[in-house]
């Protein structure tokens, strides 16, 4: 009897250990019995929270599923716009398992790679439909005036052709992401049992051949704008230069006029002073004028004067009183 007790205890201990299982933090567990997901009395999949749980050994199999939000970084794919032009969009999806039983069955045993492949197909189909209904300009830009120009943009920046076109575009990039999130969330929950938490377009590129064409157009536009600004600058410079020259000519004319008036007034005042002086003492005035004439006449050593000694020019040399020589 004792010999049988030991094997029985070992088997009982083994069965007890096999009936215990632990669900780690951040995961959830479901129990599969005879190939079917174990459900409660309400026909709802029984979810095992993190912690220690029991199962029927040999009959039950525990499948642990990640309950955290997961990120599916999709590959960049090519889409066609309403203009029949190609764009390359790189996006990502954040998702988590909501219905663990449905997820387990839809993915063939809870395979996350299968889940992401199915989810990526759904996202791509919806995104392809959204892109096909819009033009490139609507896809690459956000809401109108959202990220086109800053609030303190100068008038020159607003007046460029590219800026005017951008302001006229009602960008729908955010609307596209919102629509994809809404439509994908509904179908993903229904078919896969997962909840799409977020969808974002990381990068929107153009194929090389289209990019080169757009770059050439942008370069031509910029060169045209630069030429326009240079032409306007030269025109403004000519206007400023002409205005400056006009102001200089006006100032010089006014200065010359003022100088002439001042000179005339000074000459008149000098003549008046001379006249008054002459009236007060004509003899002295005549003497002073003769002295100035002598100084001016004899200032140069090379000058030769041939004069009659009895001429009026020498009247003060011949007579201190200025009497004329006879």
Swiss-Prot record:
Subunit structure, as described in the record: HflC and HflK may interact to form a multimeric complex.
Entry membrane topology: Single-pass membrane protein
Organism superkingdom: Bacteria
Swiss-Prot/TrEMBL keywords: Membrane, Transmembrane, Transmembrane helix
Subcellular compartments: Membrane
Name assigned to this protein: Protein HflC
Classification via SMART domains: PHB
Transmembrane feature ranges: 4-24
Organism per entry: Vibrio parahaemolyticus serotype O3:K6 (strain RIMD 2210633)
């Amino acid at each position: 009897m004792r010999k049988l007790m030991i094997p029985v205890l070992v088997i009982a201990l083994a069965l007890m250990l096999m009936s215990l299982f632990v669900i780690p933090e951040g995961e959830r567990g479901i129990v599969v019995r005879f190939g079917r997901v174990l459900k409660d009395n309400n026909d709802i999949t029984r979810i095992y929270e993190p912690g220690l749980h029991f199962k029927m050994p040999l009959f039950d199999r525990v499948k642990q599923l990640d309950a955290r939000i997961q990120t599916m970084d999709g590959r960049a794919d090519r889409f066609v716009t309403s203009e029949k032009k190609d764009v390359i969009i790189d996006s990502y999806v954040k998702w988590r398992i909501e219905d663990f039983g449905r997820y387990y069955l839809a993915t063939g045993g809870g395979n996350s790679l299968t889940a992401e492949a199915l989810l990526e197909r759904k996202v791509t189909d919806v995104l392809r439909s959204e892109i096909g209904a819009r033009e490139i300009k609507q896809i690459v830009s956000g809401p109108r005036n959202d990220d086109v120009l800053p609030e303190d943009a100068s008038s020159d920046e607003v007046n460029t052709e590219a800026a005017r076109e951008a302001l006229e575009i009602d960008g729908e990039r955010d609307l596209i992401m919102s629509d994809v999130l809404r439509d994908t969330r509904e179908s993903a929950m229904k078919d896969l049992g997962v909840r799409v938490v977020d969808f974002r377009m990381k990068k929107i590129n153009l194929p090389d051949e289209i990019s080169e064409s757009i770059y050439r157009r942008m370069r031509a536009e910029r060169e045209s704008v630069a030429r326009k600004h240079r032409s306007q600058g030269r025109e403004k410079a000519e206007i400023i230069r002409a205005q400056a020259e006009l102001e200089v000519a006006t100032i010089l004319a006014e200065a010359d006029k003022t100088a002439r008036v001042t000179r005339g007034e000074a000459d008149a005042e000098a003549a008046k002073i001379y006249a008054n002086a002459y009236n007060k003492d004509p003899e002295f005035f005549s003497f002073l004028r003769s002295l100035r004439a002598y100084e001016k006449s004899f200032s140069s050593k090379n000058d030769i004067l041939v004069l009659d000694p009895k001429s009026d020019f020498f009247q003060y040399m011949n007579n201190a009183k200025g009497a004329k020589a006879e």
